[in-house]
Design a protein with these regions (language model features):
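PLP-dependent aspartate aminotransferase-fold enzymes
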Residues: 85-195
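Electropositive phosphate-/nucleotide-binding environments in soluble metabolic enzymes
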Residues: 19-23, 50, 54, 73-76, ...
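Short, ordered coil/turn segments that flank beta-strands lining enzyme active or ligand-binding pockets
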Residues: 32-33, 166
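Short beta-strand-to-turn element immediately C-terminal to the catalytic PLP-Schiff-base lysine
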Residues: 30-31, 49-51, 139-141
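Glycine-rich loop-to-alpha-helix module at the N-terminal edge of alpha/beta enzyme cores
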Residues: 9-10, 36-124
């Protein structure tokens, strides 16, 4: 990959791979040279259903041919039907839907709703988490991808992620998850300003 290929693209997580992907089908992606690579990383839709799944392609094609986008102040039949079908599967108290496009966008909305409902601003996130790249969701993401973007949103507290494989709370082959969890919540108690 040359610098001319990336000169107009911001990175938002780690540095780009030198491999340029040209196509994908099922669980396989192909680079420009035709090399096939098993894809275990491209996200929930591709991982579970595969790239270019024929039924999904047909459904998307059909939907785009009729209506591809409207302003958020308008409703469309697919949005109404989806919202009704989803709410029918949920408990009565969860009868309203907020359709969003990405996981980061969904996490951002969830953070705002939690803050609105509680009147507080602190949240707790696992220290090995990925929640997205938007302001709040990115602040609750704890990995190398958050470097270089300045200060995160205030009030995000880190809870150590349980780690049985290499836990500092393992001795003689025994994993003391309760001690690890207690220590983690003690760390949260030390970080909070009382707005949790």
């Amino acid at each position: 990959m040359s610098t001319t290929e990336t000169e107009h693209i911001f990175r938002y997580t780690h540095e780009f791979s030198d491999t340029i992907i040209a196509s994908a089908a099922g669980a396989v992606i192909r680079d420009r040279e035709g090399r096939e690579i098993l894809d275990f990383t491209s996200g929930q839709m591709s991982s579970i259903l595969g790239h270019a799944h024929p039924e999904i392609v047909a459904t998307v094609r059909d939907g785009i041919e009729r209506l591809d986008h409207v302003h958020s102040s308008f409703l469309s039949d697919p949005v109404i039907e989806f919202s009704r079908a989803l709410s029918d599967l949920l408990p009565d108290k969860l009868s309203r839907v907020l359709p969003l496009s990405t996981g980061g966008e969904s996490n951002e909305a969830a953070l705002k709703m939690a803050k609105l409902a509680t009147g507080r601003y602190e949240i707790v996130a696992f220290d090995r988490s990925w929640h997205g790249i938007t302001g709040g969701a990115g602040s609750a993401t704890f990995n190398g991808a958050r470097r270089g973007y300045g200060a995160p949103v205030p009030g995000v507290l880190a809870l150590p992620t349980p780690h049985a494989y290499r836990s500092p709370f393992a001795s003689n082959g025994d994993y003391d998850w309760r001690a690890e969890l207690d220590w983690g919540f003690e760390m949260v108690d030390r970080q909070t300003t009382g707005s949790l």
